[in-house]
Amino acid sequence: MDEIGKQKYEKMLSKRGFVFPSFELLCDMDPELIERYENLKDYIMGKESKMPEKLRELFISVAIAVRNPSAHNQIKLHLERSIKLGSTHQECLEAFESILAPCGMMVLIAGCEALKDIVDEES
């Protein structure tokens, strides 16, 4: 990995606390793409929004569960952020319950498993 790729990787690691293996590869092979992606993500997440940040994080956790129900750590991470920003456990549960019909039981289970871990850790 060249110096530019290393800088992108380190910046991403410090902001997120983790780097997906695919993003590590992109830092190595196409750091310009990672920079453009991160700039777009930072713009979207950083702009003034009518939607409360707690809902944005909750939506992200639901979207991750829909796209990849086995991404437990990522679902949990965004649920934790949402809860820290003011979402209740009940709101988190209801977000996942609301997508049962269009998305299926596996998505609800993925959300419930992540939420259960959080509730258990808080006890």
Mark where each language-model region is:
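Acidic, glycine/proline-rich low-complexity segments that act as flexible tails and inter-domain linkers
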Residues: 1-55, 84, 110-123
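Residues within well-ordered alpha-helical secondary structure of globular protein domains
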Residues: 29, 39, 61-64, 98
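Amphipathic alpha-helical segments within well-ordered protein domains
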Residues: 41-45, 60, 79-83, 93-97
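Alpha-helical scaffolds flanking conserved acidic
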Residues: 52-59, 89-94
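Amphipathic, charged-and-aliphatic alpha-helical interface segments
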Residues: 55-71
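Mid-chain, well-packed structural core segment of small domains
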Residues: 67-93
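Substrate/cofactor-recognition hotspot
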Residues: 98, 103-106
